[in-house]
Amino acid sequence: MKILVLNAGSSTQKSCLYEIADEAFSTQASQPLWEGKINWTQDRGVAEIEVKTATGATLQESISDDSPQAHLAYMLNTLSDGDTKVIDRLSEIDVVGHRIVHGGEDYRDSVVITEDVKKAIASLSNLAPAHNPVALSGIEAIEKILKDVTQIAVFDTGFHATIPDAAAIYPGPYQWVEQGIRRYGFHGISHQYCSQRAAQILGQDVASGRLITCHLGNGCSLAAIKNGRSIDTTMGFTPLEGLMMGSRSGSVDPGILIYLLRYCDYSVEKLDEILNKASGLKGISGVSSDMREVRKAIAQGNSRAQLAWDIYVHRLRSGIGAMVTSLGGLDALVFTAGVGEHSAEIRQAACEAFGFLGLKLDLQKNQQKPVDEDIATNDSAVRVLVIHTQEDWAIAQHCWQILKN
């Protein structure tokens, strides 16, 4: 079975093609036959396209004066044409899976995409404006390029559907609940994959134990996972709540927003722009939303960069502590995504706060660029794992299961 995965971001479109045996889905992530990525400039008029294959073939091109859907079509044509060809015809693709950031209350399990599903994705775009519209654009592009191929929506909110009401419902008027305003949580595909991979690494049943998964990228969230089910998470009604992030503020006192609107002549649009794109590491440091650049600035004596680091670490530790109380203890702490996987300093800073739980980090292992490894000492009461998140593989798994069922 050939499965194409589309993972749409606010300024990127990542794609992978997997070939998976029809009779059984491997528990180990396999290397895709083909990987493609589109990076758009701010005006989306220029696309930087990168393609690579499992055999080592590569392609890099810049395309301008065309639509994003045309850019996607161009990239997908490299599947069956040129040096990066891995299939004879695009019609060989059996199914296309899409990461959909927000599924709302109605869509929690992965589903075959219909007109009703497309309408729901569109209606939820105001809750995930950077992601749902571009995902919908990708769905519509596939309809034109691959015609009647089955398309499947895999929702980032789905894994968190098991969060109990006490953790999911905000303490506002009950009318909010009736309007669907509640904690949905995000990065669910990543959190679920990492919980399953952690069980494999530790040799345990996925439906046992107490895990906290730390998805730390440009967007950041934590999930408390008990016996394989999400019971709490830091992101909420939108991906803006929770930890300090690259350019997003995370949680702030709502009174600040009222103050800015009432007394500082802020519009809703300006507030939205600031909270999502000019806050977090970028807003505090004045340097970058990229943790690597912030670290470089700290080394050069930049006090604002140091403050950004200190706030980031404080909020990460506080968030982990809150998840520990939801779980009633902790068996394993998992780090994943760009910062979580690659910043030994962040992992060490986070773990230092939890020595009282018996957590002991092996400092040497932590520095050795671990991938899918346990980096706690042998006598640590809490295991500490670094896991390379494989969202695309997880989406392919959902697609395979739906077609088989």
From Swiss-Prot:
Reaction catalyzed: acetate + ATP = acetyl phosphate + ADP
Entry note: cofactor: Mg(2+). Can also accept Mn(2+).
Enzyme active site: D156
What EC class does the entry list? transferase
Which parts of the sequence bind substrate? R99
Q: Any idea which positions bind Mg(2+)?
A: N7, E391
UniProt pathway: Metabolic intermediate biosynthesis; acetyl-CoA biosynthesis; acetyl-CoA from acetate: step 1/2
Query: In which family does this protein belong, per the annotation?
Result: Belongs to the acetokinase family.
User: What is this protein's function per UniProt?
Assistant: Catalyzes the formation of acetyl phosphate from acetate and ATP. Can also catalyze the reverse reaction.
* Subunit structure, interactors included: Homodimer.
Its recorded name reads Acetate kinase
GN (gene name):
ackA
